Amino acid sequence: MKRLLFITICTLSCILCGPLAHKAAAQTYASDLHHTTHEERAERRAERLAEYAKQIDSIVLSHNFEFNPQSVQLQPAGTLNLLSNANYTVFVWRGSLDICLPYYTGIVPPYRYVLLNTGTPNISDYVTTQTDYGWTVSFKATLYATDEYTFLFEIYSHGGATLTITNTWYNPVQYMGTISQIY
């Protein structure tokens, strides 16, 4: 009788505690699996970002790239306007500049919205500097025969770029977009 009672108690305790023990083991396994896959994803992401940073370095050091803006803003604190025209670009190629961008002229409101659509065969004071976040590229170009514009690219190693165009007569205009390689 004692044996029967002992076997019954053991059986009932196994029935009641078995799923709990199995569930705890399954949670531990799932947690370990999650940490493993999370670490693997983090490693793959770090590898992709390092590869992309190398690609950006190559593009900047070649001095041949294309800037595709996605937004424009008059500085300081102008309204941010999104750009949807695929023809708005800046090409820097072998010491020359080809530009097609909207631009704000005027010192006080109302500002005029004009199009910088020109090219110049020579740019001057070309300076490339590596920073903590990526690269800074600056140069000067004379557009429309007499007006000197300063171009400042802030190129981020994890994607994206900012272009600020300044002129002696007008407020700076800032563009945000992407940098790509010219083939």
Locate predicted features.
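Bacterial Sec-dependent N-terminal signal peptides
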Residues: M1-L33
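Helix-rich interaction surfaces within compact, conserved domain-sized segments
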Residues: D32-L33, S124-Y183
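N-terminal secretory signal peptides
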Residues: D32-V108
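A short, polar/proline- and glycine-enriched secondary-structure boundary/capping micro-motif
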Residues: G78-T79, V108-Y113, P172-T178
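Short solvent-exposed loop/turn micro-motifs enriched in small/polar/acidic residues
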Residues: N81-S84, P121, Y144-D147
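Short, low-complexity, polar/charged sequence segments that are solvent-exposed and flexible
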Residues: S84-V90, T118-G119, Y156-A161, I182-Y183
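Mature extracytoplasmic domains of secretory-pathway proteins
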Residues: T89-Q130, G134
